[in-house]
A protein has these predicted regions:
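Conserved glycine-rich Rossmann-like NAD(P)H-binding loop of the short-chain dehydrogenase/reductase
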Residues: 26-42
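Conserved glycine-rich cofactor-binding loop
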Residues: 12-13
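Residue(s) in the substrate-gating loop at a strand-loop-helix junction
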Residues: 138
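Conserved NAD(P)H cofactor-binding loop of Rossmann-fold oxidoreductase domains
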Residues: 86-91
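C-terminal helical subdomain
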Residues: 181, 198-234
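Active-site helix of classical SDR
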Residues: 118, 155
């Protein structure tokens, strides 16, 4: 039986490239979505040559609603089996000092575009009652609040909350559609440079994170946390008084940005 398309946003770098390689290896035809055309074309050429799979490229800035709608229009006629909502970014700094344009752009990418694509994919998948939707969140989405990276933490909390709610709705409907979220800690990608952070802990490789996530997705794990240390940290945090926990997070965030705030 032929496989449907796997759509990957944020496919031009980091986790997106690793997701694309893994799913191409599994034999899935791909739709690669990102802003950087040259990188997408280079990746397409590499994947087609290495894995002999169909690979479509769509250059899109999904922070813009019109681009997101245009992307959905292009995907409507394709047999969709997997959606990986991977596009996203973060920024550090005190809330009162970060640029409002960047804040809203982050909300548009991390929340609005993800929400639109997820709803489109789910409605399309419901026609055959099968498919996979993996939302890339962060361990930040499992933590109550993140001072000095407040907007980013809030967007990822939205992703984890939405994902778990929709997953439960599907379970109660006895649907075969999978909806889950990936919540990694530090990963070695260009995210760190864009967000202007330096993690105290060594990050895991993007390749390991992507492969682990795909394995867990096919195993139908709803909340995917790749590392034991992050699982333990999140679990331990639940037993702390909320205000104390948030102070600890604030202290760690200030270390990441070199106590610049």
């Amino acid at each position: 039986m032929s496989k449907g398309y796997a759509v990957i946003t944020g496919a031009s770098a980091g986790l997106g490239v690793c997701f694309a390689n893994r799913l191409a290896k599994e034999g899935y035809p791909l739709v690669l979505v990102a802003r950087r055309k040259e990188r997408l074309e280079a990746l397409r050429e590499s994947l087609e040559k290495k894995y002999c799979v169909i690979c479509k490229v769509i250059v899109s800035d999904i922070s813009k609603e019109k681009d997101c709608k245009a992307l959905i229009k292009e995907l409507k006629e394709l047999p969709l089996e997997i959606l990986i909502n991977n596009a996203g970014f973060g920024e550090c700094g005190a809330f009162s000092e970060t640029n409002i344009k960047n804040d809203l752009n982050m909300i548009d990418v991390n929340i609005k575009a993800l929400h639109m694509l997820m709803k489109f994919a789910l409605l399309k998948m419901k026609k055959k009652d099968k498919g996979y939707i993996l939302n890339v969140a962060s361990s930040a989405g499992l933590i109550p609040a993140g001072p000095f990276m407040s907007t980013y933490y809030a967007t990822k909390s939205y992703v984890t909350s939405l994902t778990q709610a929709v997953s439960e709705e599907l379970r109660q409907a006895k649907s075969h559609i999978y909806v889950g979220c990936l919540c990694p800690g530090p990963v070695d990608t260009e995210f760190n440079e864009v967000a202007n952070v330096k993690f105290a802990l060594k990050g895991i490789s993007a390749e390991y994170c992507a492969n682990y996530a795909i394995d867990q997705m096919f195993a139908r794990k709803k909340v995917i946390v790749p590392e034991l240390r992050m699982k333990m940290a999140v679990t331990f945090g639940r037993y702390l008084p909320l205000s104390f926990y948030i102070r600890i997070v604030a202290k760690q965030q200030k270390k990441k940005i070199g106590n610049k705030v």
